[in-house]
A protein has these predicted regions:
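Residue-level recognition of single "structural anchor" positions
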Residues: 1-147
């Protein structure tokens, strides 16, 4: 899980690529909020690549600083309205600006250390979006379990 791709896992564990991919396909990892209501959430986005460097995919996610958990995330275009309508459909709370983003920016760094597909100048990317989402689901579940 520490920044290892499918071929790295094959080499370390001695499994075939097909076996590792089958395990990813069967994976049921999902993040689930541990609370019904959060007092403050920080939201940020960053891009990753699927297939090739020209194909950017945006990840928009919500982070709770006090628990260190990733509460929700959505993949899509870098469209603020679409992201907030999807993730925070019921939210009527006030929004806080960029002055309070130190924690989530630090979390972005932690994500980049854990998931190689999130590294800015990486040669590691998923060919199909399906595997990309599976790897991030596992990575986020792992990050949440560590907190």
């Amino acid at each position: 899980m520490e920044n290892d791709g499918i071929r790295d896992i094959c080499s370390i564990a001695g499994y075939s690529k097909d076996k590792v991919q089958a395990a990813l396909q069967r994976s049921k990892h999902e993040i689930k909020p541990t609370q019904k209501h959060y007092d403050v959430l920080q939201v940020d986005e960053f891009h990753t690549f699927v297939g090739h460097k020209k194909n950017k995919v945006w990840l928009i996610y919500a982070y709770h600083q006090k628990t260190g958990q990733i509460v929700a995330f959505v993949w899509g275009k870098r469209d603020l309205k679409t992201a907030f309508d999807t993730v925070f459909a019921d939210a009527n709370e006030r929004w806080v600006g960029k002055q309070h983003t130190k924690a989530i920016e630090g979390n972005n760094c932690a994500i980049r250390h854990r998931i190689s597909r999130a590294v800015r100048k990486s040669c590691c990317f998923s060919k199909p979006l399906f595997y990309h989402i599976k790897v991030f689901n596992i990575g986020f579940a792992y990050i949440n379990a560590c907190h």
